A protein has these predicted regions:
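Beta1/beta-strand and adjacent pyrophosphate-binding region of the FAD-binding site
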Residues: 2-14
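Core beta-strand elements of the Rossmann-like FAD/NAD(P) dinucleotide-binding domain
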Residues: 2-4, 191-201
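A conserved short coil-to-beta-strand element within the FAD-binding core of flavoproteins
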Residues: 168-182
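Dinucleotide-binding Rossmann-like beta1-alpha1 core, especially the glycine-rich loop
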Residues: 47-128
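Flavin (primarily FAD) binding-site architecture
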Residues: 204-219
Length: 502
């Protein structure tokens, strides 16, 4: 039976972050994901790296400070999939007075270390404003955007780069302590193949299933309860041609973002709704759609209706239950619980957390685990560059560099590769000298060479992995085109698995 230093269960952002950090400190690491990387909460966020301006109202100063400081760290770690964005906050005096917002923004500017992101300012909305004419003033501040699913992917690739192992579609079915070690059982959900490992330590980073794995996988009492809070978003054709996002205040004191996305679209969200069902079955409700449309329409001149929605997505935030009365008041901070058996076989469990603070969460997790691993390496992730991030400049600069090296690339394709794969693009293009060398075009410039790369290097096994998480090609591909991808994948994955087996 193979023995690992650490087995991490859960392939979302926290699991991938902890696994990458541990592997980089010299531990032998295995990460297990029951479905696909980032298949739940971690691909259903607002796609922001932000301090969380509204958390200041709930006195979450530690969380906000840590998140603010992480923005510029993550921009340097993943410049191909993260970039700064300005946010405009229309002022509505009956909701929050200007002095309160100014104080909040002053704290936002100064709570975290900020060297490259510009500070907040007041703004006047003139005749060319996209907002309703009665909204004449507001504020503007800095946060950042990130491709959430690809941030998870980049961390999983880092696990492998540092000598670890990542298995997707491999469900951990049981874990128990035995003779000072963990015995972990798992099963391939496609083939039924059974696995058995020993591990010196175990991490439960299963997100919405963290308590369920305590109950059913380990038969241990969970140290904390969790509350599942659903957040839903709607996607519509681009509502304005400005680069800025908008943060809208609503009568219920909640806020809604309107975020420009991929040139053609705007993301509007999110909601905060208590959720009691299966996290895998989460979906938007009509009441949430109506809520988001109502908040948007109260602010913008361009009005939207149900028929304008081109896509929706929902996720469940597994928040540590602090007995708050309302979903929006529950802390977004994380709690790390660790316990062992006679000083051996530690179990570290993750409750809560935000996309923005995943790296610090992982660092704190390793601080708690370090005493169990004499000789473990030091913290290292703050100055690392994630796979794909070696672009030496901006995403636009790298797209131009790609077109110089591969002059057959269209501007849109070079931009897609730059913003999706960054410096890993050269694994896709190789020695190609024409578009014909990239193989079949499945639609919207989604070529066979890209899909091969996704299978070979990014754990893609299903169509939805490729077109909704590694990329967002699903926004453009027809049902017929998606069916063709499914056929191609079935044949290629089978061939891929046979070659690996041999």
């Amino acid at each position: 039976m193979e023995t690992k230093d650490l087995i991490v269960i859960g392939g979302g952002i926290n699991g991938a972050g902890i696994a990458a950090d541990a592997a980089g400190r010299g531990l032998s690491v295995l990460m297990l994901e029951a479905q696909d990387l980032a298949c739940a909460t971690s691909s259903a966020s607002s796609k922001l790296i932000h301090g969380g301006l509204r958390y200041l109202e709930h006195y979450e100063f530690r969380l906000v400070s840590e998140a603010l400081a992480e923005r510029e760290v993550l921009l340097k770690m993943a410049p191909h999939i993260a970039f700064p964005m300005r946010f405009r906050l229309p002022h509505r005096p009956h909701l929050r007075p200007a002095w309160m917002i100014r104080i909040g923004l002053f704290m936002y500017d100064h709570l975290g270390k900020r060297t490259s992101l510009p500070g907040s300012t007041g703004v006047r909305f003139g005749a060319d404003s996209v907002l309703k004419p009665e909204i004449v003033r507001g504020f503007e501040y800095s946060d950042c955007w990130v491709d959430d699913a690809r941030l998870v992917l980049a961390n999983a690739q880092m696990v492998v780069r540092k000598g670890g192992e990542v298995l997707t579609r491999t469900r951990a079915t049981a874990a128990r302590r035995e003779n000072g070690l963990w015995i972990v059982e798992a099963e391939d959900i496609d083939t039924g193949k059974k696995y058995l490992w020993q591990a010196r330590g175990l991490v439960n980073a299963t997100g919405p299933w963290v308590k369920q794995f305590f109950d059913e996988g380990m038969h241990l009492p969970s140290p904390y309860g969790i509350r599942l809070i659903k957040g839903s978003h709607i996607v519509v054709p681009r509502v304005h041609n400005q680069k800025q996002a908008y943060i809208l205040q609503n009568e219920d004191k909640r806020i809604v973002f309107v975020i420009p996305w991929m040139e053609e679209f705007s993301i509007i969200g999110t909601t905060d709704v208590e959720y009691k069902g299966d996290p895998k079955a989460v979906k938007i409700e009509e009441s949430e759609i109506n809520y988001l449309l109502k908040v948007y329409n109260a602010h913008f001149q361009k009005q939207l209706g149900r028929d304008d929605i081109v896509w929706t997505y929902s996720g469940v935030r597994p928040l540590c239950d602090d007995e708050s009365d309302s979903p929006q008041a529950i802390t977004r901070d994380y709690t790390l619980d660790i316990h062992d058996e006679n000083g051996k076989a530690p179990l570290l469990s993750v409750f809560g957390g935000k996309l923005t603070t995943y790296r610090k969460l992982a660092e704190h997790a390793m601080e708690k685990l370090a005493s169990y691993y004499p000789g473990i390496g030091p913290a290292w992730t703050k100055t690392c560059v994630l796979p794909g991030g070696d672009i030496d400049g901006s995403r636009e600069d790298y797209a131009a560099k790609l077109r110089r090296r591969y002059p057959f690339l269209t501007e849109s394709l070079a931009r897609h590769y730059s913003r999706t794969y960054g410096s890993n693009t050269e694994w896709i293009l190789g020695e190609a000298t024409s578009l014909l060398d990239l193989g079949e075009d499945f639609g919207h410039e989604f070529y066979e060479a890209e899909l091969k790369y996704l299978v070979d290097h990014e754990w893609v096994r299903r169509t939805e992995d490729a077109i909704w998480r590694r990329t967002k090609e699903g926004m453009w591909l027809t049902a017929e085109q998606q069916s063709r991808i499914t056929q191609w994948l079935a044949a290629y994955v089978e061939k891929h698995q046979l070659s690996m087996a041999s």
